[in-house]
Every structure is written in C-alpha cells, then in structure tokens.
C-alpha cells in the first residue's frame, strides 16, 4: 500500500503511542513495544502504519500528520455549523456535531476529506486553509484567486491540506518549502477538551461522558458490585475506558446498558465453594 504525502509515519506512531499510554497507563507502553505490537499484527514500517491508520487509526481519531487534529477539526466544524466565532464554540456544540458525523459512519478525518475541506473548515489550529489558498494564488500569478485555487484543488479530488503537504516547495508556482500557515490566535478554536473520571456506586447509575477521553470505574465496594443491572453508561465522544470488577455479590447476571465506550476491562472474582453440580 503506497503511503500518501499526508501520512507522516513518525508523527502517526507518536500520536498512537500517546493514545495507548492514555488508555492503559499501567501497561508500560514504549515506542519499541508499540512497534513490536504493530509488527506482530502485520503492520510493518511506514506502509504498515498507514494500513493501520486506514483500518483503525482514523476511527480512533489518531492524527496522520502534525497539521490535523481531530478535536480541533470537530470544533472548527461546529463553529461553521452553528455560525459562531471559533473562540466562542461550546463543548455542547462540538459534541453535537461529532455525534452527527459519527452517526453517519464518518470520523474527523474522513469527514474532512469528504466534506470539510470543500466547506472551508480548517483541519486544525496549525493550518489555515484560507491563508494557504491565498498564498498559492500569489504563487500561481496570472489572474489566479484563492477561490479559483480552491476549485482546482477540489476538482483534482484533493483536500487543501493534502495539496499543501504534497506540493509545497516543489516548484516555482508553489508556496515555499517550509512555509507554514497557522490559524491567527483570534480565530483559533478551543484546542483542549474536558476529560472526566466517573466512579460508579452501589445504587443505580446513569452516567454520560464528555467529548474527551473519559474513564468509568466500577470497583467492588463494601462487598457489592458497582456495575450492575439498571446502570446506564454512555461514553459520548472521545476514547473512553470502563474498568469494572465483578464479584459474586448477586444471584443474577449483571445487565448494564453500555454504549460509546471504546475500551472495556473486566476483572471477575468469586469466593464460592464448588458444589459439584
């Protein structure tokens, strides 16, 4: 599988490492361990990492380069969708837009490729599409405008970011090598999201996560399960984790309702004698 210009192997692996370290801090993830895990599953080198991105990474919101950020893209799309200033977009608006996108079978990267770039939505605070299009029009000269450049890029089946990463510095009609186009400070969207840890109780719990990477802990308390029938957990957006210990404190199987939680870890324990049946 050929590796496209938008895919930066080192950046992707660094971002993936951060994701697994956040999801499982006790696992002792290192870059060497991650690369070994990739290789054991058939994802070797840059081509293998790109294959992993296509199969898993995009859906996990792991950025393939330094100029894309899933959280910032969702925020930029929300600002455009609701018609508000980028700095004024709220977490509720961001979460709602992300829900719309994911419920239609897309993620930040695939939505940007299919729709966002053509709509003029920035892929992150690190890349101002309008600034790049204006600079590219100047480099082209001879009556070119930013609008004409945008149409030409779209007509060639590319996003603005892909065009920049593939062609910057490659010819006299291109922008200079190493030129960057960060979003102005007063037009940046919020770059961080709230992540929360929730502890379940021995009562009935109904918990909804944030758009961040939330953790739900359901540990045994006073010899009782805290994850039990009647509990409802909705992780919401982000890469969420449920840690649950289950003991034999009830006569019936626990049947909680769980959705939008990406990682679920169960530990089961029992202290009952075998009755021979």
Each language-model region and where it sits:
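Solvent-exposed, low-complexity segments and loops of surface/extracellular structural proteins
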Residues: 1, 141, 146, 180-277
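Charge-rich, low-complexity intrinsically disordered regions
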Residues: 1-190
